[in-house]
C-alpha cells in the first residue's frame, strides 16, 4: 500500500454485540439465513473477473442463532487492478462447494444475474463515476472498463456454466429444464 485514498469499511456487527467468523463448518451452513447470496456474488465475480477466491465472513448478533454471510475483499476484481479479464472456471469462486449446494438452476441466480444482464451502460457509468480518479489514472482507462463490463453482461451465464461443468461439480442439485 502507498499513500493516497484508501477504502475501509466498518464491522458488520460491533465486536461487543456479536461474533464474526471467517469459517463455518458444513453443519452450521444450514443456519446461514442468506446462503443463496453465494449464487449472487458468483454472478458478480464472474462479471468482474475476480481473480481471487471469493472471501466471506459469517456473523451473528449475540442472542441470534442464525448467521448472515457478508462478502469481503473485492480487490482482485478486474484481475487485481490489471483491468484485464482472463476468465477461468475456478476464478472468483468460494473455496468450498457446500455453499452452492442449494443451487438448482438459473432461478437460483435471480435476481442478481438478471440485474447484471439488464443493466444499461448509463447505470454502469453512474457507478464508475464514483471511483476516485487516483484509482484509475486516465479517463480512457475508465471508459475502456465500462465498455468491457457492458459487453461482459451477456457472458456471465456462460461463465457460470463453465464453473458448473468444471471438475469441481459445484451444483449437485442443478437440474436442466427441457422445453
Residue ranges and their predicted role:
Residues 1-16:
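Short, structured active-site "lid" loops
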Residues 5, 9, 37, 156-160:
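Bulky hydrophobic/aromatic packing residues
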Residues 7-8, 53, 70, 148:
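Generic structural signal for residues positioned in beta-strands
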Residues 7-10, 23-25, 92, 113-117:
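Short, functional N-terminal and low-complexity linear motifs
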Residues 18, 24, 28-33, 101-105, ...:
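Residue-level signal for well-ordered alpha-helical segments
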Residues 20-83:
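Conserved kinase catalytic-core segment
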Residues 61-179:
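C-terminal catalytic region of ATP-dependent kinase domains
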Amino acid at each position: 500500500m502507498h499513500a493516497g485514498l484508501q477504502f475501509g469499511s466498518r464491522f458488520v456487527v460491533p465486536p461487543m454485540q456479536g461474533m464474526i467468523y471467517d469459517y463455518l463448518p458444513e453443519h452450521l451452513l444450514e443456519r446461514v439465513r442468506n446462503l443463496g447470496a453465494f449464487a449472487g456474488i458468483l454472478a458478480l465475480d464472474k462479471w468482474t473477473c475476480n481473480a481471487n477466491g471469493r472471501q466471506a465472513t459469517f456473523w451473528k448478533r449475540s442472542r441470534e442463532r442464525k448467521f448472515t454471510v457478508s462478502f469481503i475483499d473485492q480487490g482482485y476484481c478486474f484481475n487485481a487492478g490489471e483491468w484485464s479479464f482472463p476468465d477461468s472456471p475456478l476464478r472468483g469462486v468460494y473455496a468450498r462447494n457446500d455453499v452452492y449446494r442449494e443451487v438448482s438452476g438459473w432461478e437460483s441466480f435471480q435476481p442478481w444475474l438478471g440485474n447484471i444482464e439488464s443493466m444499461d451502460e448509463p447505470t454502469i457509468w453512474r457507478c464508475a463515476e464514483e471511483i476516485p480518479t487516483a484509482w484509475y489514472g486516465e479517463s480512457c482507462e475508465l471508459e475502456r472498463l465500462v465498455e468491457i463490463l457492458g459487453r461482459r453482461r451477456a457472458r456471465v451465464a456462460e461463465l457460470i456454466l463453465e464453473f458448473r461443468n468444471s471438475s469441481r461439480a459445484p451444483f449437485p442439485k442443478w437440474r436442466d429444464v427441457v422445453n
